[in-house]
């Protein structure tokens, strides 16, 4: 229905590849235990190699950057085709002819990308704080706040992935 930027998607592919390779290296070589989950303050335990903490955090930052850029580019493409009010289906609340039909897939993706972009920014702030603590171990943060940021970032990401996956299934089903 829309055309995202091919160049940006290729750049995102490289960022995602680097992020995944970094996480694999931190986990398998550096024995970084928390994996991608990284519930605070677990990443800063001294059970694994110190470098693996930084590699894991930077890797998830690369992944988050790629996801945020992709989300924003999809939103840009949808707004370019359907307009801001059109992508959210507001035309159906007005009297009269709504004009061009909004495919359900576009509405689902638009709403998912708005939620995803907002919570990916929360995840970016959280990861910058993780990076700051890795560079300056004397820093300490509120564990409950960090836990909530991890959950908001991670669970929203998983949910929008499910929503978009279900939208693809609906799109493929015969009408």
Predicted regions, residues:
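Hydrophobic alpha-helical transmembrane segments of multi-pass integral membrane proteins
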Residues: 1-175
């Amino acid at each position: 229905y829309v055309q995202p930027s091919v160049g940006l998607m290729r750049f995102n592919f490289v960022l995602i590849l680097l992020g995944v390779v970094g996480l694999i290296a931190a986990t398998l070589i550096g024995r970084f235990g928390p994996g991608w989950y990284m519930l605070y303050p677990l990443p800063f335990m001294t059970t694994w190699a110190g470098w693996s903490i930084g590699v894991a955090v930077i890797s998830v930052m690369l992944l988050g950057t790629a996801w945020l850029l992709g989300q924003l580019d999809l939103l840009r493409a949808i707004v370019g085709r359907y307009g801001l009010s059109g992508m959210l289906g507001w035309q159906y609340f007005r009297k009269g002819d709504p004009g061009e039909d909004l495919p359900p897939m576009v509405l689902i993706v638009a709403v998912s990308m708005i939620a995803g972009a907002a919570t990916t920014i929360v995840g970016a702030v959280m990861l910058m704080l993780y990076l700051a603590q890795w560079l300056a171990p004397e820093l300490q943060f509120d564990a409950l706040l960090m836990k909530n940021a991890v959950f908001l970032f991670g669970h929203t990401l998983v949910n929008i992935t499910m929503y978009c996956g279900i939208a693809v299934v609906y799109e493929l089903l015969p009408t």
